[in-house]
A protein has these predicted regions:
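Beta-strand elements within well-structured catalytic alpha/beta cores of enzymes
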Residues: 76-82, 190, 224-232
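Divalent-metal (often Zn2+) His-rich catalytic cores of metallo-beta-lactamase-fold enzymes
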Residues: 232-235, 241
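Catalytic metal-binding/acid-base residues of hydrolase active sites
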Residues: 84-86, 234-235
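Short helix/loop capping segments that flank catalytic or ligand/cofactor-binding pockets
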Residues: 89-90, 238
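Flexible, D/E/H-enriched segments
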Residues: 1-73, 98-211, 215-219, 239-314
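Glycine-rich loop at the start of a catalytic domain that most often binds anionic cofactors/ligands
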Residues: 90-99
């Protein structure tokens, strides 16, 4: 939704959501028709044009505020905890956890898309408007993570570069194109398999991963100002406010036990991206959650949509 225009929030998703694979709030496969039949009577009132426009405005105000806060931190490096959705990895080889340590990472240039293809146009916003970009990676810090994790009995996949046709996935390109626009801040991409069975990383493992990252940041010999960002939503593509608010409460109170005990069955499809938030929270236990904005962005009467969350620890 973050790449879509206001009019697409209001109208276009109503059709596309009826065709996509969906999971209910228990994590079971379901259909749009089944969700619509089970929705409360007032569900249509949650997706009026005015309410969806207001959700759009709140969301992009939060995006702008998070960008402002990132700009103000004077970071030396930004760790991106994201998920790869068949962009670099496929079912032929899907690591549960990977760290990219090449010196740069490529984002591709946009391709021409027919104007009537609103979804394709939205997808292109993740790519570069004119030519490929090669963004800097803090390779030494990435290698420090890889070597330190292996020493801690963490079997992490090491990714040293891309083939000519590959480029970074949207969890990473969105950060570059939106929050780091115009900057050449080095990053360290963490690639989590949140989406795809049979080896989705567990919430407990995400907590362990984040804790180890915090230790390794502290032990790095160079004095760096390091940030970590979770790139991904809370619940989607069925909004689950109960799940989201439980996660948010745990973030505020640093309740890693709650996050570790989240039922993996509920973390399917887009909701699986909560795992990235778990990694970031576990890496930031020495910091306090200073700001958070949550928008349950419903987009159909079946209550599909995305639980949008934006936060800052410091």
């Amino acid at each position: 939704m973050l790449a879509a225009e206001r009019e697409d929030w209001i109208a276009s998703f109503r059709d596309s959501d009826q065709l996509m694979p969906l999971y209910d709030r228990s994590g079971a496969r379901t259909t749009y028709a089944e969700l619509l039949a089970a929705a409360p009577r007032d569900s249509a009132d949650r997706v009026t044009e005015s309410k969806m426009a207001a959700a759009y405005d709140r969301t992009f105000a939060a995006v702008a505020e998070l960008k402002r806060q990132i700009d103000a931190t004077s970071l030396d490096v930004l760790i991106i905890a994201g998920d790869d959705q068949h962009e670099l990895f496929h079912d032929t080889m899907m690591p549960a956890l990977a760290i990219y340590y090449g010196k740069t990472i490529r984002n591709a240039a946009q391709q021409d898309v027919p104007h009537e293809n609103w979804y394709g146009r939205a997808q292109m916003q993740r790519l570069e408007p004119e030519r490929d970009a090669h963004y800097p990676v803090h390779a030494n810090l990435a290698l420090h993570f890889i070597e330190g994790l292996v020493a801690r009995d963490f079997d992490v996949c090491a990714v040293g570069g891309l083939t000519a046709e590959q480029h970074e996935g949207h969890a990473y390109s969105y950060i570059h194109r939106t929050y780091l626009e115009g900057r050449h801040l080095p990053v360290v991409p963490l690639l989590l398999n949140t989406y795809y069975p049979p080896n989705q990383v567990t919430p407990q493992r995400c907590v362990q991963f984040g804790r180890h990252l915090r230790e390794l940041i502290a032990s790095y010999p160079e004095d760096l100002r390091v940030g970590i960002i979770a790139s991904g939503g809370l619940s989607h593509f069925v909004v689950d406010e109960e799940l989201d608010l439980g996660v948010i409460t745990a973030l505020k109170t640093k309740n890693l036990d709650h996050l570790a005990r989240l039922d993996p069955k509920r973390l399917q499809a887009g909701s699986s991206e909560i795992r990235g938030w778990i990694v970031a929270a576990a890496a930031a236990t020495d910091l306090d959650l200073q700001w958070l904005e949550y928008i349950p962005a419903y987009r159909t009467p079946a209550l599909t949509g995305i639980g949008m969350a934006f936060a800052r620890w410091s």
